Amino acid sequence: YDMQPRFSPDGKRLLFTSDRGGSDNLWTLLLDGSDPRPVSADKEHVINTGDWSPDGDYVVGRKRLTDQSSIGTVELWLYHRMGGNGVQVTKKSEIPDANDPTFSPDGRWIYFAARDRRYQYNRNVYEGIWQIRGYDRKTGNFRPLTDGYGGSARPRVAPDGKQIAFIRRDRSHTLLMTHDLATGREHVVMDGLDHDMQENFAWTGTYSGYAWMPDGKSLVISYGGKIHRVEAANGTAHDIPFTVHVEQAVTQALRFPQNIAPENVRIRMLSWPQVSPDGSTLLFSTLGRLYKQPWPKGSPVVLANQGPRSYSPAFSVDGKHIAYVSWSDVNAGEVWVMNAGGGNGRRVTSSPGQYANPAFSKDGKKVTFLRGSGATERGRDLDEELWLDLMWAPVSGGEPQYVVTLGNRGAARRMPRLSWTPDGTRIFYFEDKGSGDDERTVLASIRPDGTDRQEHFKIKHGEEIMVSPDGRWAAFTRDFQGYLTALPVLGRDPVELSGESGPLPAYRFAQEGADWITWTADGKAITWSEGPIVHRVTLADIQNSWDKEKDEAGQKTDPAFKAKTPEEKKKEPPTVHPDTTEVRLLVPRAHPTGVVAFRGARIITEKGDEVISQGTIVVQDDKILAIGPEGSVTIPAGARVIDAAGKTIMPGMVDVHAHLHYNSLDIIPEAISPYYANLAYGVTTVHDPSASNYTAFSQSEMVSAGVTEGPRVFSTGYILYGAESPGRAEIQSLDDAKRHIRRMKRLGAFTVKSYMQPRRDQRQWVLAAARDESIMVVPEGGGNLEMNMSMILDGHTGIEHALPVTPIYKDVVTLFAKSHTGYTPTLLVAYGGLSGEHWFYQHDDVWKNEKLLRFVPRGWLDARSRRRAVMATDDDWHHMDVAAGAKKVMEAGGHVQLGAHGQLQGLGAHWELWGLTQGGMTPAEALRAATIMGAEYIGLDKWIGSLEAGKLADFVVLDANPLEDIHNSNTVRYVVKNGEVWNGDNMDRIWPSPRTRPLFPWESQGQMLEPLNMMGH
């Protein structure tokens, strides 16, 4: 993808940005297109927006630095035309974001636009986000040049060096202006440019590139879909007509049909898997139950008498007992011990709470565990614990003892897991210390009385760390890979490890996921899981492979406590030979039995433009048996008939970008309020393109199996993250990409989210690997139009999030429409300007919504809605312009689908739907985006998205017609999902048998603020 051309001072070559080397870098070529040469050749960073020095020897460009945030920061760097690594001009520590560099005609100054701090959403552009600065190449000093309201950006110096052209926001308009360098006087050249990128990430500049004509009397600039020459003195514009005939090769977008209605559900998300000390039994938790099966082969069976939900099982060292924790939304949880064969458990703890990760001492007399701060008692969710107390208790009974308080690692991370030293005098655990780039996962130990805390080692991006029973070794996970390392005994500052290189040896034994690492009781083997696959490898096997590696390197050593050479090895490590079993747990897919019919309603089928003015739908079990005009459909005898006269029926909404925020700390509640909120508002299918692997896939299986109620839940799981943070997906080759795709597929994903992998070749590797595994790729759009265009060319399933540039013209619209790549504009967080959700908060007293308050904690809703974070005039809302672009794509034959981004559960999907019409879509077009197009996008249209005989029974009964007024989508009377019928007002089930909605944890235990009577307020 080539862009941003600039003539060299002698007019013989073009400087441009190209990803032809795999990543955006600066290149030059002759005017006839020959002799392409790289100026920068950075393999780690994106470099673009170059400008020549007047002597033609140097080029200045912007280098994006990705850190713990994928947005990152930007520095300016200077490159010689012959190459080299470049010379730094600005530092991120001094200027967090530098952009739009350009030289003065004498070469002394580099002028650029600077943002005073890192990117922040919904900043007030009228206060001036960007201002122009100058860098003096003689003195090394910086000086500010502008301080204007509306910002100042995209500077271009006139040929005589006396004035600088720039762009500025004035109310809802973008102006072209000039700044006199001698007097500071500023002059408006013209009004009417396209919307600038000052409020966006500005990946390739704050406005399209433009230039002065050589005589300095006019400028060439683009707006309105055309190129113009604008006279600097008076703003008179002259069109520069051009025609381009384009023949563009586009890779077929990835899209694979899915079977979401099998007879049985394959359970893939095993948690806490471990093999009994005698090697005969595999123990694990899934679906909120404890299971065991013979190792290595056999069939799983449920251990009996465990209570409502059971998690976190652990064998005693002798294998005779199992410790585990329970959870009930009403009564909270406890720690229990039971015989390994099953039966009634004996409670170890004496106070209800959220417990996790019990571990027996070697003598079996004590058990240590974690206890939460009581989040649900305060009206919070399970993942919102303020802290976790490490405690222990006698197995025989007695008061639990407090040891130390640990931090909450967050719902995307594993809760600390615990173990004892052989003599029972210390407890090992891990926790995170530091923040930002200094964050490390630390292995520590402490005495049971809370004294003598020691730190043993630390690691960047560490996930789990488990110490061997003899205390000599530790197994840990980092970036989804498993390692073994020697455990030092130093009594001083902890050693920092770094994967396979560093001060201590570390051997990578698992490359495609290493969840729930556990040592066998004798310390001779390690177990871990990859979804339904459980591995066990002996320490001897690892050491033999380690020795083999040393032999091949010509440095045979005893691996214990001997450091490796510091060089990073690019070759694959020798293969260990784990024992492996694939747990094949199949449970029946839940669905009701019987027949229910809705009669007399207007039916929007989404089968083309079909609307049945007065029709009947008959549902048998979980599928539509018949549908058609009233009188043409026979209702079977004995069916439950619901009178829907005067109502409107439409397919259930499909939210393809639904962040459910259903996170937990490994312990999953019985009733999940975001699920009920979405169902209550008619969202019957959700697809979350960024979520905790464990939580998302576990709960998806729970819903399918009928253990938990909710919409159909699908997810990418955790993103394939390109930033430098825990959980990143490092992709430096096609093989790396294949490992990540296989890892996610094993967990149950049929989509993955490629998230801000900075280089195009990295994104292409993900696509190639996904195509081989029949996986769809829904990438983070990132507010980068040029990257989005290359994503379309390369065959991504869709673009998640808005194209930040508005308006979009025929070139972009045509490429989108003809590529079959889907567009999810997420208007509530529309990139490039004000987020759409604030428009709805501004125009709706959301805190008074009594229905919403049944599913959302009032305190949370008050905090979001009672004091508006943003107030703006109606002509200043960017999401409407984004919606207008989506309308163009749909009109041209493209696919647009609804994604509400989880900004407000349930009601937010309707806001997103209504936002589509604010850009010009008709109600019928918006409803298609919310139903059948969303289903088609992720390969579900065989089963859902339209109302046809044989499809799954997912639909909504409305009191009013949304084709007449789109706001009538929020008049939900009944919700039907998978054949079950609920009251849309309170989510009490109506059919096949009445059932009152259960209380949520924050209702049943917490100090919930009751919805107030808002009359008169």
Language-model regions: role of each:
Residues 674-694, 710-721, 745-757, 767, ...:
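Divalent metal-dependent hydrolysis catalytic cores, especially in the metallo-beta-lactamase
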